[in-house]
Amino acid sequence: MKYIYWSGGLDSTYLLCKTARNTTEEIQPIYIIFPETRSRGAADLEINAQNDLLPLIRAEDGITATILKPIQIKEEEIPHDIEFESAYERMYNEDIISKHYMYRSLGKLAKQYPGIMIGIEAPPPGTRENNIGKTENAITSYGIKIEEDGTLILEENGNKDIYTIFGNMKFCMVHINAIDELNELHEWGYDDLIPLCRTCCTALPQQCGVCSNCEIKMRYGDTFKKYMPKAYVNYQVKQYLRTIEEKYATLYTIFVWGSGHLNSGKFTSNASGQVENFYLSTNTVNKLETWFNLLLDNYPNFDKVNRADYGIE
């Protein structure tokens, strides 16, 4: 039996397909429904993607494994584990822990499903030193070696708490990037799966292009343009706004997440990657919405839109 953490996203879907082509064993996909993804509606969309993808994957040429019905478990239903939770508490202030809520329970679940494969991919070429991603860099910095097949090995002076948190998982895609994934999916004749994968972490019906998950894919240039056309345009607008002021890029992200609307008054948002407080008057909201819509209408000729004409400094 092989275990794969499958969200219905591109990376874990690629991993599921690749594994199912290279084994005759049963494969058990597993998915955790976190309160964070449930509250924003993303969990429902990811489960819908799994439901759409699974029968197609099973029917693809070259699939030799039996892929079982996914186990979809709420985080609060995962049994307590004192050893894991104590290690997690001690290491909570480390960035790899505190900034990624999935590790709060994924390693605990991995004790029930040892060797569960995680579809965290390599970074886009040229965006990180030696093409080593943040996850690989973080794990190895604690004295833990990632073997070729993704198995973690605790070295002599390695951090035992970090190993307790991650040690039952296999990070078997840290040297495979999204271009590699697309190329292999194309070679296998699985192009039909790509548009059905759920990359975005919002509850929007289409990929937003401006959340952290979407932005990783957008950094591949035009690679994902045909698969995520609206997301691609949103990303280009956001990048343009960054050249003016980061504040506008953040407000544009909120605008996209609000389906083309901003709220007036006082509100908080983590659209920039950290929680920030905002206050926007109704007049400012109207100006910003007009500006953002004109940028979308004039894409890619942003220079045709003079923000000063709409009262934007």
Where are the language model's segments positioned?
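Nucleotide-activated chemistry modules centered on ATP-dependent adenylation/adenylyltransferase
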Residues: 1-313
